[in-house]
Amino acid sequence: MTLLFDKTGPIDSPTLAPASVDNHCRSPDRSAAARVIEIGLVNNMSDAALRATERQFMRLLRAGSGEHLVRLHCFALPSVQRSPATRQRIDSLYADIADLRHTRLDALIVTGAEPRAATLQSEPYWDEMRALVDWAEANTRSTIWSCLAAHAAVLHLDGIERERLPQKCSGVFAGEQVNDDALLSDLPSPLKVPHSRLNDLAADRLAARGYEVLTHAPNAGVDIFARQGRSRFVFFQGHPEYDATSLQREYLRDIGRFLTGERHDYPEFPVDYFDADIEDALDAFRAEAEAARDPAIIARLPHLALRQGTAEGIETTANALFRNWLISLASEP
């Protein structure tokens, strides 16, 4: 799936809308002369999140493209476990990851993946991820590494091991800028970034190996950090690309897994995410669910509502980040 779009046109793709003749959206009066920013998306998210991840990054790239044309190429690591239906979809719509060797890209976005093993080195995609890090270093001007992909990249590059958290970091956290960087230009203060992870990278260990921490959240730790080598690598421990209800969907998924016995512990609700009254109702539902572990009681889950300003804060932060990233790509030769 290769898409060409700019801020003025809708994204036209097999994922989002009925496809037009060539699945491209372009501005005819500008595209012939304008330089196109070529970006690859290596989408390794779970089957359930695959399409949402496509939409989220497409939306942010379109919103941030301004006067620039952006062409997005979609890839996926073949060793990520897939259902037959999802594998067929990837095979029909995505480019083969081997095609990266023959594709000129300005930048890359690499998503995380659902953990399957206790360590990154034991994941089935570990060798492919290592090779991707090396390729991106040699062949892109900038690459974004998101969540688990960020952890994998720093482990391969500098041997920095992530640390298991005592409980999952899930919520929308208020981050603050701790270093000046063009990537952070005109970002709101505080930043609002969703996090959803079981592991963490310590700021002091990153700094000791030459990484620059750009933003930090008191209750979530390092948020965005960067490394300048042959390519400028930008790392997200969180998920700025998430839409407003992504954490809600994950929370409901985990409740369902608890009720069916797929997980032994009841999930905590995301921090600073749901309305305070809803949190009280969710605590009451949890007590009921733990007392009577029955999938049927999901019908009694209270109606969910987000805290005021949450959706707007997430969107404003993410739009500014990706706008600044695209500006940096457009300004370089």
Curated annotation (Swiss-Prot):
Purpose of the protein: Transfers a succinyl group from succinyl-CoA to L-homoserine, forming succinyl-L-homoserine.
PANTHER family (alphabetical): HOMOSERINE O-SUCCINYLTRANSFERASE
NCBIfam families in alphabetical order: PRK05368.1-3
GO annotations of cellular component type: cytoplasm
Signal sequence annotation: none
Protein origin, superkingdom: Bacteria
Keywords linked to the UniProt accession: Acyltransferase, Amino-acid biosynthesis, Cytoplasm, Methionine biosynthesis, Transferase
Enzyme class: transferase
Residues given in the record as substrate binding sites: K168, S196, R253
One example GO MF annotation: homoserine O-acetyltransferase activity
Protein name (record): Homoserine O-succinyltransferase
Source species: Rhodopseudomonas palustris
Site (Important for substrate specificity): S196
Positions bearing the site annotation: Important for acyl-CoA specificity: E114, L148
E.C. numbers: 2.3.1.46
Residues of the active site: C147, H239, E241
One GO term (biological process): methionine biosynthetic process
Catalytic reactions on record: L-homoserine + succinyl-CoA = O-succinyl-L-homoserine + CoA
